[in-house]
């Protein structure tokens, strides 16, 4: 049994434990906080893992500061529904399902309810346009679908997402070395329970800035109203830069909660609230920073790519990454602890990128009945 302390990287540890089959015990979870123990979204995440596995054993002490997790078999299944709450976005839960779903006994078909877009977690738009194309490179192709049924902005959410994931016997080793040149930029400016004028203003500002760098920029406007618009007003922008070699780099920003819903209210709140133009500019600059950092995979999806490289057949996988995030650095440590795999890391001084190389462990889907 592996032992850890503290609440950091809780989700990483549960995912790696489930895939590796190694039991874990986490102690001192926020034991010095005013409200010690697991948070509601962490408990919800454990319930989700319990729904898609069979034989998992989860023990939490009375204060919630210690958890023992003995993983079971990933079974997947259809017709599953999960309430994600309003503290974290649906993306927080979908990221874990992407890691676990391909190795289930049966294909996964699940509906998750909550917040579809926020500034903390990956939004569903980014997962659809950037994360899923990366997963397809590992051989998970047919039947990998994510669909927004309802959009839900913070603080009340009300969104709904359907995620379908096929199963595979094993992954395919990858060689993502050539990042290529930027070919085009695409995006989605969305608005819920608010005038479409807001998303149009975000779109115009971002497009104007990006056209200074490349002529092929297209951003669509996506306005939700009525039943499909969730319970809170909000707007945001997701941008994706596609390269000549098929790599995707993304950036996203969401409006602050408690935004103004009319032009008059917006004028009153200018000193404390971000205008749509500010948000468009912030997102465009965030995308330009991702492009400047380089790499074949953006900063949001680094850890996912490294995990799948470890799970690949016993073959060499290589990937070129840009600036390494603290989250990715910690995840590399988790991969070493759970799977015993280390990476060969080669910095490239010319492109300011880093080349990661590893030998896969030959992970096979032992849960499936037959193929």
UniProtKB/Swiss-Prot annotation:
Keywords: Nucleus, Ribosome biogenesis. The keyword Zinc-finger does not apply. GO terms for biological process: endonucleolytic cleavage of tricistronic rRNA transcript (SSU-rRNA, 5.8S rRNA, LSU-rRNA); ribosomal small subunit biogenesis. It comes from the Eukaryota. Disulfide bonds: none annotated. The keyword Nucleus applies. CDD domains: RNA_Cyclase_Class_I. It is found in: Nucleus, Nucleolus. SUPFAM superfamilies: EPT/RTPC-like (SSF55205). Belongs to the RNA 3'-terminal cyclase family. Type 2 subfamily. Part of the small subunit (SSU) processome, composed of more than 70 proteins and the RNA chaperone small nucleolar RNA (snoRNA) U3. This is Probable RNA 3'-terminal phosphate cyclase-like protein. It comes from Dictyostelium discoideum. The lineage of its organism: Eukaryota, Amoebozoa, Evosea, Eumycetozoa, Dictyostelia.
């Amino acid at each position: 049994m592996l032992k850890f302390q503290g609440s950091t990287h809780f989700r990483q540890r549960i995912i790696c434990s489930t895939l590796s089959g190694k039991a874990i015990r986490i102690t001192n979870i926020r034991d010095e906080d005013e409200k010690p123990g697991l948070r509601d979204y962490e408990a919800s995440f454990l319930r989700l893992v319990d729904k898609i596995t069979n034989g998992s054993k989860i023990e939490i002490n009375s204060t919630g500061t210690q958890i023992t997790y003995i993983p079971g078999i990933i079974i997947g299944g259809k017709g599953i529904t999960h309430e994600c709450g309003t503290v974290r976005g649906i993306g927080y839960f979908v990221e874990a399902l992407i890691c676990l779903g391909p190795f289930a006994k049966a294909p996964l078909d699940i509906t998750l309810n909550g917040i579809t877009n926020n500034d903390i977690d990956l939004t569903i738009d980014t997962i659809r346009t950037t994360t899923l194309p990366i997963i397809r490179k590992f051989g998970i192709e047919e039947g990998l679908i994510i669909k927004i049924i309802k959009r839900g902005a913070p603080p009340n959410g009300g969104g709904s997402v359907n995620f379908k994931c096929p199963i595979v016997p094993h992954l395919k080793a990858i060689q993502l070395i050539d990042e290529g040149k930027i070919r085009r930029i695409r995006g989605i400016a969305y608005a819920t329970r608010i005038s479409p004028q807001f998303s149009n203003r975000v779109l115009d500002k971002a497009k104007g800035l990006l056209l200074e760098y490349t002529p092929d920029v297209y951003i669509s406007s996506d306005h939700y109203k009525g039943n499909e618009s969730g319970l809170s007003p909000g707007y945001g922008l997701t941008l994706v830069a596609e390269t000549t070699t098929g790599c995707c780099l993304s950036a996203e920003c969401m409006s602050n909660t408690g935004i103004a819903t009319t032009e008059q209210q917006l004028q009153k709140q200018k000193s404390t609230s971000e205008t749509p133009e500010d948000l468009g500019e912030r997102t465009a600059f965030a995308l330009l920073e991702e492009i400047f950092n380089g790499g074949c995979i953006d900063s949001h999806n680094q850890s996912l790519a490294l995990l799948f490289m470890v799970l690949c057949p016993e073959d060499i996988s290589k990937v070129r990454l840009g600036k390494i995030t603290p989250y990715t650095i910690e995840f590399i440590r988790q991969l070493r602890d759970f799977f015993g795999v280390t990476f060969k890391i080669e910095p490239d001084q010319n492109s300011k990128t880093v080349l990661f190389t590893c030998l896969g462990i030959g992970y096979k889907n032992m849960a499936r009945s037959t193929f």
